[in-house]
Amino acid sequence: MSSLRRRIETVMRSGPDENMGLTGAVLRLVSLVYGLVMRLRYKLYQKGFFKTGKAPCMVVSVGNITVGGTGKTPMAIYLARLFNDWGLNVAIASRGYGGTMQKQGGAASDGKDILLTPAEAGDEPWLMAVKLPGVPVVVGGDRVKSANLCASQFGTRILILDDAFSRLAIDRDLNLLLVDSQAPFGNGHVFPRGLLREPAEFASRADAVIRTRADRGAGQAALPQGKPVFSCTHKPKGFLEYFPQKGTSGPKIVRHSLDDLKGKKVAAFAGIADNQGFFDGLSSLGVAVLDRLSFPDHHAYTLRDRNIIVETAIKADVKALITTEKDLVRLTGWDAHGLDLYALEIALEFEQAQKFEDFLKSKLQIGE
């Protein structure tokens, strides 16, 4: 990561009134302009200058208002499994960030077969497709087009929009806003001085707020008034061992319990929004992390990166590597030079699951 990028990220995560020198001043100026643009954009949608399309099925939007990870993908998976368990015909629509099919759009999965590679679908949609048998997953920047595809090809009754809180071009029946429990709005500044994708007052568009990683404690930022607030945690579920295979079906995965890797000496690496949280989580599970490597969020691993990872493991004298599920997807086909390769599997757990389910049924008018 370049020194400039590191400096910008430091400013974005600094205190709201902290003096960050010339870089901070420049980013503050840019963020003021960006905030004005986002307010104008919202007004243009309100006045009808920008059109909001209607889907032919019920739409549940899952998203955040900040840059970085708040658990959108685990939440989309949680909802898809829940609706599927209720006997509802559900599908997921994702933008397909980083995938070659983002502009064209298409089905990553029809609920039976995986139809696209990770490079085509994007890492997160492909991961959802693998983890959700029976649930179609489509990708594409045009969410209305994706909704029509799901309704016509799969008979979808409920469509989950992944990462769509700020995507105003499609109407939705339920708008779920995910916020980090410790810092719901970052430092309160919009991008690039802070982490906000749009001004914090726009959080009021949410029908409900979900505090993720609630086990880390709650921050002091005021959440939208009059909105139900639910809390959930990211719980380690187990470890996935990776064996490379070619084709859209991706790698062969073998599941292990959390106890299977206790005391195992590994080198860890990650390219997500909260790498340190991932490393700390491994240590808390009893994994002996002897060395670690951090990469930017959504990092595309080059041959050089992979060689550095292997060299790190060799220097640490370990026989295994461990990473996140999202990073594992980006390494499809990699044999890790004979090293064992694992990923930590994460699942959401609500503090008051029944209360949240009752809320969903009420808002979406789903019968028992």
UniProtKB/Swiss-Prot annotation:
InterPro entries: LpxK (IPR003758), P-loop_NTPase (IPR027417). One of its GO terms (biological process) is lipid A biosynthetic process. It holds the Pfam family LpxK. It comes from the Bacteria. Pathway: Glycolipid biosynthesis; lipid IV(A) biosynthesis; lipid IV(A) from (3R)-3-hydroxytetradecanoyl-[acyl-carrier-protein] and UDP-N-acetyl-alpha-D-glucosamine: step 6/6. Its EC number is 2.7.1.130. ATP binds at T66, V67, G68, G69, T70, G71, K72, T73. GO terms for molecular function: ATP binding; tetraacyldisaccharide 4'-kinase activity. Disulfide bonds: none annotated. GO terms for cellular component: plasma membrane. Keywords: ATP-binding, Kinase, Lipid A biosynthesis, Lipid biosynthesis, Lipid metabolism, Nucleotide-binding, Transferase. The keyword ATP-binding applies. It catalyses: a lipid A disaccharide + ATP = a lipid IVA + ADP + H(+). Belongs to the LpxK family. Transfers the gamma-phosphate of ATP to the 4'-position of a tetraacyldisaccharide 1-phosphate intermediate (termed DS-1-P) to form tetraacyldisaccharide 1,4'-bis-phosphate (lipid IVA). This is Tetraacyldisaccharide 4'-kinase. It comes from Desulfatibacillum aliphaticivorans.
